[in-house]
């Protein structure tokens, strides 16, 4: 039996020690376009390494001594990034195998650097003639916009290109549009002047955040990965829950929650921990569709888990106008509720199929793990402490980088060599490219929205569609975020929905942080929402399951993420908004009880298998507890209490 299981795991492209076959790696890279960059050999690899090292050192320098003037910082950031994108996402991959750059890619890389370098060289002149766009400026600006769009196609994907082009077209064809969507229209000169030569477009807030906070946090994550912190998380999760019913699946949930504290990518999280946890779940007896779904749901939650959430969380702090630490504090309780919801789903599935955990004798002892690997958590603890102490995210991330290198030196088996430190600089720069280009693309969207006023028009249209019905407006906003999230990266998705949908919610009295967090959540959860569920597709690629069924199972497990945003809009106290200890506790407890009911309904199990009526009652009772009114809370508790009692006594009789 063990041999059959082993063969089954290996057939899906994962060996016993978690190593993935080339075919599986290729599949996963296709799903995670941002990490699907070329691996050159020879002199080309050295050229890439030098550019990446210079890029990372520039970011570290400005992090240490302070960012340069906004436009200069962002232009240098874009110059490095866009050059690397054209070299690392080549026209013809056959040239990569031969260890050569394609001449077209080299030419495009040079061409793409000309617009930001033009701004750097002519910076003082551009300031003196602010608002005046010369013919040369127009040509350079058009070139810059076109090169960014092509870079986005290469490293982010076609959907964001389509969205950006739609907004650009809207800017041009405003006079020909019907009704409230019509506007005077923008000339090429006006559009280029606004999008490329101000800090309202390409070089706007998203690029500003990318060139300061985000890059350094990605670099910090690269060094934490080099130390082996991911393995420490899996070992700790094994010690906590490996022995319990359905142990390996619970290990996946806990390790992904911990991994999410340092990573902001759903697919990367699935790939990072799924190669170990998914085979473990399959060996225990979980169906391959469910095993892939567990990892997908847990890994997607990583972007919701502080202190390092997705790149969009840094943008949220800027858009809302609050310190990043306030976003982190607001996100803590909802993130914990989400992972409890996934954990409950896993637990009920294990009980339903009588799946046992790993014997304690086969698990590593707590003491040994902490003794050998505990020092790896020092950087994470330090960065939380620094953020809580009032350090800016940029300074905290910079300190975290140096602390991660220093703490790794405490034991010989984790000590970094000079080549490891250099490799961290290279990996950090490569890892930042997708976010960088997504931010520059998102900047164009913001530029068109602010220049044409379409944001307010669409927000008003959303309110009209919902006919002033608050719940219907929330539902329309949710659908918009989910649809955008199916093909557009979280960063761009958040930018679009926060400029269009969030104002509609705010106009009806929703606190600004709650409105932004609402669209943020649904943009992320799109990664497990069929039909385009990238995290679920990655999980199914490792498990060998059906992508669509894996996505459906992941959505069931992650049902909390579809409910929690409604909770913090209806009860903003859960985000710490105008909250007292009593109100936060009450909202959290009722939401938690509701989560038990909804998870039980999704899986069809509590103490024993639930029938259709019980599942409907569990769902209804759980949803009642979302509404903050006392009446609905009482109804929810009574309904759930009745089902729990029926289940309990029926399970006793069956024994």
List where the protein language model places each region.
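Membrane-interfacial loop-to-helix junctions in multi-pass transporters
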Residues: 135-139, 200-213, 239-253, 284-290, ...
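Hydrophobic transmembrane alpha-helices that form the pore/transport pathway of multi-pass ion
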Residues: 234-302, 308, 312, 321, ...
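Membrane-water interface regions at transmembrane-helix termini and the short interhelical loops
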Residues: 38, 62-67, 89-99, 125-126, ...
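Transmembrane alpha-helix interface/packing and boundary motifs in multi-pass membrane proteins
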Residues: 221-225, 256-265, 297-303, 443-446, ...
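Long, contiguous bundles of hydrophobic transmembrane helices that form the permeation core
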Residues: 2, 6-45, 329-431, 534-623, ...
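Hydrophobic mid-bilayer segments of alpha-helices in multi-pass membrane transport proteins
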Residues: 48-53, 73-86, 104-113, 138-147, ...
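Core transmembrane alpha-helical segments of multi-pass membrane transporters/permeases
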Residues: 150, 155, 163-180, 188-192, ...
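Conserved, well-structured core domains of diverse proteins
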Residues: 1-131, 138-142, 654
């Amino acid at each position: 039996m063990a041999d059959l299981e082993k063969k089954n795991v290996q057939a899906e492209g994962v060996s016993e020690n978690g190593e993935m076959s080339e075919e599986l790696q290729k599949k996963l890279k296709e799903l995670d376009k941002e990490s699907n960059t070329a691996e050159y050999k020879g002199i080309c690899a050295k050229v890439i390494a030098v550019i990446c090292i210079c890029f990372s050192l520039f970011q570290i320098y400005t992090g240490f001594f302070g960012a340069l003037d906004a436009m200069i910082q962002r232009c240098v950031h874009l110059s490095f990034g866009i050059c690397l994108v054209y070299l690392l996402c080549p026209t013809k991959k056959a040239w990569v195998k031969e260890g050569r750059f394609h001449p077209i890619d080299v030419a495009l890389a040079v061409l793409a650097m000309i617009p930001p370098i033009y701004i750097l060289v002519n910076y003082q002149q551009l300031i003196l003639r602010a608002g005046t766009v010369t013919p040369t400026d127009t040509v350079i600006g058009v070139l810059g916009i076109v090169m960014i769009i092509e870079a986005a196609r290469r490293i982010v994907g076609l959907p964001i290109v389509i969205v950006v082009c739609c907004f650009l077209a809207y800017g041009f064809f405003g006079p020909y549009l019907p009704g409230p969507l019509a506007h005077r229209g923008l000339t090429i000169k006006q559009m280029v002047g606004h999008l490329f030569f101000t800090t309202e477009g390409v070089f706007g807030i998203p690029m500003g955040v990318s060139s300061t906070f985000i890059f350094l946090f990605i670099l910090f994550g690269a060094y934490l990965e080099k130390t082996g912190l991911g393995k420490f998380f899996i070992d700790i999760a094994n010690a906590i829950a490996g022995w319990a019913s359905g142990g390996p699946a619970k290990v996946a949930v806990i390790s992904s929650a911990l991994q999410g504290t340092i990573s902001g990518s759903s697919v990367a999280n699935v790939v990072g921990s799924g190669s170990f946890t998914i085979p473990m779940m399959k060996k225990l007896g979980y169906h391959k569709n469910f095993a892939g779904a567990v990892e997908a749901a847990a890994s997607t939650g990583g972007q919701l888990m502080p202190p390092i959430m997705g790149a969009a969380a840094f943008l949220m702090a800027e858009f809302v106008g609050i310190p990043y630490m306030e976003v982190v504090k607001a996100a803590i309780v909802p993130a914990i509720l989400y992972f409890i919801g996934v954990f409950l789903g896993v637990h009920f599935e294990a009980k339903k199929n009588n799946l046992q955990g790993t014997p304690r004798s086969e698990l590593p002892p707590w003491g040994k793990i902490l003794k050998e690997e505990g020092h790896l958590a020092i950087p994470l603890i330090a960065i939380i402490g620094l953020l809580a102490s009032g350090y800016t995210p940029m300074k905290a991330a910079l300190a975290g980088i140096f602390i991660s290198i220093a703490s790794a030196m405490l034991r010989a088996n984790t000590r970094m060599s000079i080549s490891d430190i250099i490799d961290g600089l290279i990996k950090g720069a490569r890892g930042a490219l997708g976010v960088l280009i997504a931010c520059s693309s998102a900047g164009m969207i913001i530029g068109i929205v602010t220049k044409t006023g379409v944001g307010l028009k669409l927000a008003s249209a959303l309110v009209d569609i919902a006919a002033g019905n608050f719940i219907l407006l929330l539902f329309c906003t949710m659908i918009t975020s989910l649809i955008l999230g199916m093909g557009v990266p979280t960063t761009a998705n958040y930018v679009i929905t926060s400029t269009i949908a969030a104002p509609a919610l705010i106009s009806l009295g929703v606190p600004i942080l709650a409105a932004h967090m609402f669209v943020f959540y649904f943009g992320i959860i799109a990664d497990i929402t069929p039909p385009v569920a990238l995290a679920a597709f990655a999980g199914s690629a490792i498990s060998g399951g059906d992508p669509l069924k894996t996505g459906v199972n992941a959505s069931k497990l992650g049902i909390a993420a579809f409910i929690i945003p409604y909770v913090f809009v209806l009860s903003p106290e859960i985000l710490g908004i105008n909250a007292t200890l009593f109100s936060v506790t009450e909202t959290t407890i009722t939401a938690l009880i509701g989560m038990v009911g909804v998870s039980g309904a999704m899986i069809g199990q509590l103490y024993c298998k639930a029938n259709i009526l019980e599942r409907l009652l569990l769902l209804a009772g759980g949803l009642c507890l979302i509404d903050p009114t006392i009446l609905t809370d009482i109804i929810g508790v009574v309904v759930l209490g009745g089902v729990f009692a029926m289940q309990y006594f029926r399970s006793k009789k069956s024994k």
